Amino acid sequence: MLPGCIFLMILLILQVKEKVILGVEGQQLVYPKKLPLMQKRDIGHTHDDDIEETYEEELMYEIKLNRKTLVLHLLRSREFLGSNYSETFYSMKGEAFTRHLQIMDHCFYQGSIVHEYDSAASISTCNGLRGFFRVNDQRYLIEPVKYSDEGEHLVFKYNPRVPYVANYSCTELNFTRKTVPGDTESEGDPKMKAIHNEKYIELFIVADDTVYRRNSHPHNKLRNRIWGMVNFVNMIYKTLNIHVTLVGIEIWTHEDKIELHSNIETTLLRFSSWQERILKTRKDFDHVVLLSGKWIYTHVQGISYPAGMCLPYYSTSIIKDLLPDTNIIANRMAHQLGHNLGMQHDEFPCTCPSGKCVMDSDGSIPALKFSKCSQNQYHQYLKDYKPTCMLNIPFPCNFDDFQFCGNKKLDEGEECDCGPPQECTNPCCDAHTCVLKPGFTCAEGECCESCQIKKAGSICRPAEDECDFPEMCTGHSPACPKDQFRVNGFPCKNSEGYCFMGKCPTRRDQCSELFDDEATESHDICYKMNTKGNKFGYCKNKENRFLPCEEKDVRCGKIYCTGGELSYLLGEDKTYHLKDPQQNATVKCKTIFLYHDSTDIGLVASGTKCGDGMVCNNGECLNMEKVYNSTNCPSQCHENPMDDHGLQCHCEEGQAPVAWEETLNVTNVAILIVVLVLVIVGIGVLILLIRYQKCIKLKQVQSPPIETLGVENKGYFGDEQQMRTEPILPEIHFLNQRTPESLESLPTSFSSPHYITLKPASKDSRGIADPNQSAK
């Protein structure tokens, strides 16, 4: 006992002494030199230009360390503080005061070492350079001697072999979380389906009274300390495409709000209960951390619930905050967060190239990488538990307006963006210009392979169910086409169910998910229990009041199963034993009451068949025509109708839907075009006729009529010679091709020398015989 007390006293003395950092060896005095930017980046603004910012968006510092010159390239962190960030303090009387801050200007940066492929940095420039940087497998801590970014600084070298405070140890509360059945919201969300898509964790941190008193001067010391930790954690989790964002802090000024027990597991249970009952009522977050400065937990430095993320009670952890080095504390925070995301301790052969992994059990020095084992465990966690709370983006709408090459986002004018040149690992993208390298057609996407777009027809998203369809590459885009599936209401599993959002929900499958593969749906008699109106038998819950089912809806309330083992989900099981009068046998009706993301997953899932042409929807058994707005798809497609997330009707390849509305629209457009063409042609003809008439009148004025002797025709009565202005001709050529009948109607004064051709008269069949001559 006495040696232990002496050891603790020595550690306390060491922490009080200035610039003594445990866990490091050696120190070197350096003078960082601020460098001008080699190329000014095109940076968008997310706020008013009138607001003058104290801290620049991009910085470069030169540090001469161990006879080598390092150039530190830093970009101001943009996503480690949420738009709804708040701070809560307590008065002497225990009253809580909360203020909401719009943080537009801060001094926290992330970056890398120029020309060092494997490097990283998490730095604060508030009062000099303070933080962490890594070059290959060597890690450094930098601290200012004076409050200046170009004055004296000390650089410490982390050494995992140097003993400090106590060998790191953590623990997990012993409980098991079973796979959460797929709910329609998370299953239909493309972000949840794509494991590698961005996820977001809204983090809230509570500091106990001891941590507050140790960091109360200057007044913003504790805030900057916590911000530095979160900036470090954010940098670590970016490698998993997770953005860890701080949405608030609470400082237990003057007294702790729970009793901090000597047993850390007991303290975790108390803190979990407090945050769910009190903290959750005034702040939304995904995970909460308690920073405790008490010397009561022996060698254990942290604790959390395994795979507890997004469960209101279990998304909690405790971190022991006893060291002056924030990087060590932040690394422990990242470690416990990993447990909450389903990761376990790394043991051989689970290793990292740089030597240390985030999930190493010793946690002796800061680590930035996750082993392949940890990555696989996290991906399996996403598939098993579907943590939908990680989908909402905690940034303002205009956050993406901040555009520049190197932000790992595809901005306007960019072909690719793999991050800063020192961090880029994409062989297809030029990190300096954010354009594809010569000869390449893509940099990323499900339809991009070896920097080339896959050929058309390559499957990029296989079918997950008989109600789903595989998606294939188009041959001209690196992205996989939008997910499409069979129309809602299409019969599936031998008519046991109907397709719903690409799945075929049945009671049999839901029972096996809730309990185990041996479980199946129980007898129909069980569903009469849904008329009771309690948490084990109801259809709807309004303000914590369980409403009984109407007779027509009993099969859409709680689901009742038989067989299988007891559920290991965090919920309550209930088994009824009912008498079946027809078979004179006892029937087991097993159900469960469990909330997941504010939804009782013990209810019959929406889309489950409850009768012919009937499906469950929010505790009611309804006709599919009332539930689905795409039930007319089978009438539009000959067979195999499809649907998508927008409930739009499609047909499989080779079929064309009878889109009457679209056909009518096309017909109307065609008619309109024809009418317009006819009108234009008519106007043109009218103009030509007017010009033609004017031309005739003009010629009549310029040339007098030509009198032509009539041709002798014995068809006339007598031998009288007639003088006519209208010649009788064997051939007449008019531009407008008049008929003989129209010629007979011409006026006797008509004369047109330009359009009538005169030819010698000849005897032909058109001549009229002289009756006198015939008589002779």
Swiss-Prot record:
Its main location: membrane. Glycans are attached at N84, N167, N174, N584, N629, N665. Residues 199-394 form the Peptidase M12B domain. GO terms for biological process: epididymis development; epithelial cell morphogenesis; positive regulation of flagellated sperm motility; positive regulation of sperm capacitation; proteolysis. The chain crosses the membrane at residues 670-690. InterPro entries: ADAM_Cys-rich, Disintegrin_CS, Disintegrin_dom, Disintegrin_dom_sf, MetalloPept_cat_dom_sf, Peptidase_M12B, Peptidase_M12B_N, Reprolysin_adamalysin. It is found in: Membrane. Residues 757-776 are annotated as: Disordered. GO terms for molecular function: metalloendopeptidase activity. Required for normal male fertility via maintenance of epithelial cell morphology in the caput epididymis and subsequently correct epididymis lumen structure required for sperm development. Plays a role in sperm motility, flagella morphology and tyrosine phosphorylation during sperm capacitance. Plays a role in normal expression levels of HSPA5, ITM2B and ADAM2 in sperm both prior to and post-capacitation. This is a non catalytic metalloprotease-like protein. This is Disintegrin and metalloproteinase domain-containing protein 7. It comes from Macaca fascicularis (Crab-eating macaque).
